[in-house]
Amino acid sequence: MTTLAVLFSGGGRTVLNLLNKIEDGELNAKIVLAIASKNTISGIDILADRGLDIAIARQDMDTQEDANNKISAWLNEAKPDLILLCGYLSLLPIEPWMQGKVLNIHPALLPDFGGKGMYGMRVHEAVIAHQKATSGCTVHFVDEEYDHGPTILQETCEVSSEETPK
């Protein structure tokens, strides 16, 4: 069984999908650590209702450095097989033991429409603004840069001229 740590910054939809796959027996994994980027995001209650204990990286007065130190300690204690960035918006410092274990899902075909601040609806708006005929998603290993690192998988979809970001 693969042990997973998940980090999220929003509603937790990707983590919910993982939980469903695990519960349905489609994914032989266990989430051993769930980390919310800050204490105000909606996914905390949603995922807690599904039985996950949620660690909060950044409380009201914490700096990002404080949050990164907490995350590092939690990850070093849990030592998961894989660390999944499930809509996690901060840059995660990659420690040597984490190389090749941290994966990100990005809602575009990287390297296009990636980088700091390019997430969610912003990515889809950029795809439409650039009149791209195709878009898609990328799963990649994470390195020290936003939306960078070796690609694992890309899936494409057509974008019609009538398409909206939603």
Predicted regions and their residues:
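One-carbon transfer enzymes
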Residues: 1-166
